[in-house]
Every structure is written in structure tokens, then in C-alpha cells.
Curated annotation (Swiss-Prot):
It is found in: Cell outer membrane. Keywords: Cell outer membrane, Disulfide bond, Ion transport, Membrane, Porin, Transmembrane, Transmembrane beta strand, Transport. Disulfide bond interactions within and between MOMP molecules and other components form high molecular-weight oligomers. The keyword Ribosomal protein does not apply. One of its GO terms (cellular component) is cell outer membrane. It is a multi-pass membrane protein. GO terms for molecular function: porin activity. This is Major outer membrane protein. Coiled coil: none annotated. GO terms for biological process: monoatomic ion transport. Belongs to the Gram-negative porin family. The lineage of its organism: Bacteria, Pseudomonadati, Pseudomonadota, Gammaproteobacteria, Pasteurellales.
Length: 22
């Protein structure tokens, strides 16, 4: 899954779950 940190950086969490980091 592609998710975004609070600072707008993109994170790949392997598609297992979607989270908002930071």
C-alpha cells in the first residue's frame, strides 16, 4: 500500500495495511 507521512513523504508498507505514520 502507498501511504503518506504527515510531512508528505511517500511510504510503501508492502500492501499489508494502510497507516498514517509520523
Amino acid at each position: 500500500a502507498t501511504v503518506y507521512n504527515n510531512d508528505g513523504t511517500q511510504v510503501d508498507v508492502g500492501g499489508r495495511f494502510d497507516v498514517a505514520l509520523g
